[in-house]
């Protein structure tokens, strides 16, 4: 497949707020479009070369880069780290017009996005994902946050001005974790009912070919942003994006986060597809199509031995719980999700039935 040009789409979120999603080889060159005169760069520790490249692109267009700082991993999702970042940005001389460019995975996008959204009552951001999980999902949608007695308990909705998917940066992700993001891609396939992009491009994207990887990221982020544009603050429709996450989050927590988010969501999708078959009438063949995509991506469909029983006991702690039920998305058909109140006990029993009580 020939290298595709940079694809670009604008998503209007409100009268005065929009997010531009751009993906393709050369997407980084779009960065100056979002600059407000000065810039500050936050990047993963392993991406210093990419940060320097971004700085050269910005400076060549007359944008002053005030400074850069490295960080990454779940440790950045703390108020201590955010306080340090606030201090560094203030020392560098950021102003209300400064744009913060964030090159990294989901944890860094969350934490640095939160820092930018609160400093001076909100600085503009540009997200540049470095992982498949971020490129297919986390880089768009505007959720920021840090951990406090639980994951993402302190945060804001702060949509980036741009999301730039430079496939060479994403393709450089280490093998461990590269496949994880494909769980979120497959989730979007199930919710949208549009199987074509993944069916034709999945093997090439798994092989890290830049053009197919960028095309899938553009499609996946585009689907998510269509949903987000209709419900920016997650009061209704946007909650369909939690498909796979009720069971997935319980498994992640039960493993003390040794089971990655992407793998947890993959297993969660398998469980919630079965729940959709039983409670919403999802045809078996359509469920199997989704499971086949997860398997093609090399993702698990069941948890490690002994984990399901402990995870089943954690389902009731889900933030989506209302009384004795959880408001969660189920699929009537691929492309036809609905929000349903499912008793906590129903979800817990299903997990034990499918995977054992440990």
Curated annotation (Swiss-Prot):
Q: GO CC annotations?
A: cytoplasm
GO terms classed as biological process:
amino acid biosynthetic process; aromatic amino acid family biosynthetic process; chorismate biosynthetic process
Protein residues bound to Zn(2+):
184, 245, 261
Localization, UniProt? Cytoplasm
Which cofactors does this gene product need? NAD(+); Co(2+); Zn(2+)
| CDD domains for the chain | DHQS
Q: What class of enzyme is it?
A: lyase
Reaction(s) catalysed (UniProt annotation): 7-phospho-2-dehydro-3-deoxy-D-arabino-heptonate = 3-dehydroquinate + phosphate
Where would you say this protein principally sits, based on its record?
cytoplasm
UniProt EC number: 4.2.3.4
Pathway assignment reads:
Metabolic intermediate biosynthesis; chorismate biosynthesis; chorismate from D-erythrose 4-phosphate and phosphoenolpyruvate: step 2/7
Q: How is the cofactor bound?
A: Binds 1 divalent metal cation per subunit. Can use either Co(2+) or Zn(2+).
Q: Which InterPro entries match?
A: Dehydroquinate_synthase (IPR050071), DHQ_synth_AroB (IPR016037), DHQ_synth_fam (IPR030963), DHQS/DOIS_N (IPR030960), DHQS_C (IPR056179)
NCBIfam families named among the record's database cross-references: aroB
Described function: Catalyzes the conversion of 3-deoxy-D-arabino-heptulosonate 7-phosphate (DAHP) to dehydroquinate (DHQ).
- Which family is it part of? Belongs to the sugar phosphate cyclases superfamily. Dehydroquinate synthase family.
What name does the UniProt record give this protein?
Answer: 3-dehydroquinate synthase
């Amino acid at each position: 497949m020939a290298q595709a040009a940079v694809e670009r789409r604008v998503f209007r979120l409100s009268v005065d707020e929009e997010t531009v999603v751009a993906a393709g080889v050369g997407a980084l060159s779009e960065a100056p479009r979002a600059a407000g005169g000065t810039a500050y760069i936050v990047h993963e520790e392993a991406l210093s070369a990419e940060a320097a490249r971004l700085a050269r692109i910005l400076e060549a267009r007359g944008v002053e880069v005030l400074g850069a700082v490295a960080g990454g991993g779940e440790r950045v999702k703390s108020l201590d780290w955010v306080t340090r970042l606030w201090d560094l940005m203030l020392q560098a001389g950021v102003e209300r017009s400064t744009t913060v460019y964030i090159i990294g995975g989901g944890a860094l996008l969350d934490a640095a996005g939160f820092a930018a959204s609160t400093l001076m009552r909100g600085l503009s951001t540009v997200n540049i994902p470095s992982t498949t999980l971020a490129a297919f999902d986390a880089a768009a949608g505007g959720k920021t946050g840090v951990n406090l007695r639980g994951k993402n308990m302190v945060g804001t909705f702060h949509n980036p001005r741009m999301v730039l998917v430079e496939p060479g940066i994403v393709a450089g992700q280490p093998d461990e974790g590269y496949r994880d993001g494909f769980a979120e891609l497959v989730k979007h396939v199930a919710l949208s009912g549009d199987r074509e992009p993944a069916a034709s491009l999945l093997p090439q994207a798994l092989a890290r070919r830049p053009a197919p990887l960028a095309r899938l990221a553009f499609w996946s982020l585009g689907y998510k942003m269509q949903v987000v544009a209709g419900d920016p603050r997650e009061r209704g429709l946007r909650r369909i994006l939690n498909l796979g996450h009720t069971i997935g989050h319980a498994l992640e927590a039960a493993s003390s986060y040794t089971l990655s988010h992407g793998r947890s969501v993959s297993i969660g999708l398998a469980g919630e597809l079965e729940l959709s078959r039983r409670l919403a009438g999802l045809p078996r063949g359509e469920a199997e199509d989704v499971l086949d995509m997860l398997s093609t991506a090399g993702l698990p469909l069941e948890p490690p031995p002994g984990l399901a029983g402990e995870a089943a006991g954690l389902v009731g702690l889900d933030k989506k719980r209302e009384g004795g039920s959880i408001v969660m998305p189920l699929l009537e058909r691929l492309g036809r999700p609905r929000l349903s109140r499912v008793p906590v006990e129903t979800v817990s029993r299903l997990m034990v039935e499918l995977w054992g009580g440990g």
